Amino acid sequence: MSKIVKVLGREIIDSRGNPTVEAEVHLEGGFVGMAAAPSGASTGSREALELRDGDKSRFLGKGVLKALEAVNGPIAEALLGKDATDQAAIDQVMIDLDGTENKSKFGANAILAVSLANAKAGAAAKGMPLYEHIAELNGTAGQFSMPLPMMNIINGGEHADNNVDIQEFMIQPVGAKTFREAVRIGAEVFHNLAKVLKAKGLSTAVGDEGGFAPNLESNAAALAAIKEAVEAAGYELGKDVTLAMDCAASEFYDKEAGNYNMKGEGKIFTSEEFNFYLQDLANQYPIVSIEDGLDESDWAGFKHQTELLGDKLQIVGDDLFVTNTKILAEGIEKGVANSILIKFNQIGSLTETLAAIKMAKDAGYTAVISHRSGETEDATIADLAVGTAAGQIKTGSMSRSDRVAKYNQLLRIEEALGAKAPFNGLKEVKGQA
């Protein structure tokens, strides 16, 4: 019933109008799993390779026909007859067949799409929801929780065409008692932020992740606008809603000069100065989580940041760790950061993703499940967050169907699981329990 009889891939379009890989895995019992690979804009240099065609006459070089050749050729051939419910074995076949450190032969986009489609097919064969199957694969069968959302309501950096250097300003509805209530609070703040920005004569156009993308005089001005919106929605900042930021600092790091050039504010910082700048923002506003607060290569700076802020704040490594257990292990050993951002396509398979989550949790780090700026209607990360009881999720704002698809899937899961999947709110954030 769970043997693979067919694997196929196709080229579909993501939320930025670029092609991506979608895969289907068909089993002998008539079960089918389908999944699509996401794509990032601000990417870590050590991420698994996303294979693009480079043919400028087609999709401006962004086509994925080479990756599809791998899916429909060697990957499909190698997986025929294999048991889809043995996810680790399926992923290992593809990893071995690719044979490179960073999946550059077939592309992480090819391997990941098949890996996730296989997980969905395996869940169907077992007659269970994907989150339940993931919990079993994770060795935590029956252990679920609903994640605290980090909602990216002001976009900057590589995710927007504005002058704001910091990439994401997020809210966390920590006063909510359920995930459903958290979504409502987030939506109400989002709509009030639109009113606040309009009243200031600012743009309410949205960026890649559905947050507003106005030009602002400073990064602090973004936080001030969110504070105003939270209060206008009838909530108290710091009690009902907390703040989080993704600096994506690698995007404004000047490697030659070794400093951080925030062109939007006209300021240049050393690593140490930028850490104190972040500390100052966290003293002014109830920021509880900072992601990629320095360049991915600035490990000495990250060590200082962790020592300076890590007892009070969640210090999240995204480009820093790229969902890679080898790099994460080094970070744990050196006491760098205290949390990891989890992105499937940074590593390229479900099995390796689960290994990174487990390593983080075993070391006392938190794991934040995340989308990418280039997304599709695929909502697998919702099931991943619940099935691993990760506790936190980043999946954009309260607009754009590519973001809302994940929130809606989480609402369905909460309805199905009820009390079996508690919503723990702020307790899930490192340093806030």
From Swiss-Prot:
Biological process according to GO: glycolytic process
Localization: Cytoplasm; Secreted; Cell surface
Annotated pathway: Carbohydrate degradation; glycolysis; pyruvate from D-glyceraldehyde 3-phosphate: step 4/5
Keywords annotated in UniProt: Cytoplasm, Glycolysis, Lyase, Magnesium, Metal-binding, Secreted
Presence of the UniProt keyword Magnesium in the record: yes
Class in the EC hierarchy, top level: lyase
InterPro entries named in the record: Enolase, Enolase-like_C_sf, Enolase-like_N, Enolase_C, Enolase_CS, Enolase_N
Subunit structure: Component of the RNA degradosome, a multiprotein complex involved in RNA processing and mRNA degradation.
Protein name: Enolase
Species of provenance: Photobacterium profundum (strain SS9)
